[in-house]
């Protein structure tokens, strides 16, 4: 049996002011081509299909169309990640399951939808335990004792995977391939140069970290999601892989080689995982240099998303404008002055507080403040004036 494991699509994710839907369409089409060319029997998506719990219509459509196209030739299983809405997954599940797409939004008992077997997979000799993202404090009704919820998050994750492990071993026997698909952080994995990077920092700290002991010994393969850097999970008793995101989602992921994982599995043997590169997606590049040196690389950098730090001897009021004119995919630009000198202070003068805030926002973000944010700021100022 051959499985394609992918994760962390984050459909709808933006990079600064730049929409990335065209890139996502390209890489998702690449995933479809790989699935067909490698004749895979099952596709697993280990969470964060969308970037927001309530995706915009074009994002929702792209995700659903991709899942349905993948399911035309084999079953598809997708669990909800921390960016996904469990309720959305559960609402869509009965509509999509007849088409071969199995969405699991919440953590369920093994005998109540938490484990998917051959009957739901068109006779495929596999049994798959599905572990969506678990939020801190979330009660799962098949825990042995309610008192266990006062234990640490890592213990809760391990208890749930232990229960799934038992169900997998019992149902797989000697004839089926047991698989676990999960969306959580294992401590000790490589997160990246900038910490949480494209992930929500709230869900990347110690409070949301499990240990490698949470990976049980029963599955022949564990398909992990949540970490965007593709990698093998260290210290586990069975093969476990973070497939990683399909695109470099922010500059902390610049230079990473994105992939899907092709898994060869058969009953009674540990699976073998193979990396298949994803070639689509625009480059993300960080550059620190003088403006003249950066401008000399215009041809090289013109098609890349850029984070520029420009070495300058003094104030250059036209830097942002020139940078945006030269580089259409510029995301950030900032001046670096000798000795780390701070930028000139903003002075109010005759300007309104809203005008001052608008300039501050423009300096910090290299783009105009959204109208709704300016309106909110104005309301706060008016409320402060009224109570002064």
Task: Pin down the residues of each PLM region.
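N-terminal active-site segment of His-dependent metallophosphoesterases
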Residues: 1-72, 378-383, 387-388
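Active-site neighborhood of phospho(di)ester-bond hydrolases with catalytic His/Asp-centered motifs
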Residues: 6-7, 43-48, 76-82, 102-107, ...
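Active-site neighborhood of divalent metal-dependent phosphoester/pyrophosphate hydrolases
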Residues: 10-12, 40-58, 75-87, 186-207
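Metal-dependent catalytic neighborhoods of phosphoester/phosphodiester hydrolases
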Residues: 14-16, 49-67, 80-100, 104-105, ...
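Accessory, non-catalytic peripheral segments of nucleic-acid enzymes
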Residues: 37, 42, 264-388
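Conserved catalytic scaffold of divalent metal-dependent phosphoesterases
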Residues: 91-94, 98-204, 266
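Conserved beta-sheet core of the metallophosphoesterase superfamily
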Residues: 98-100, 186-269
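Binuclear metal-dependent phosphoesterase catalytic core
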Residues: 112-127, 131, 238-305
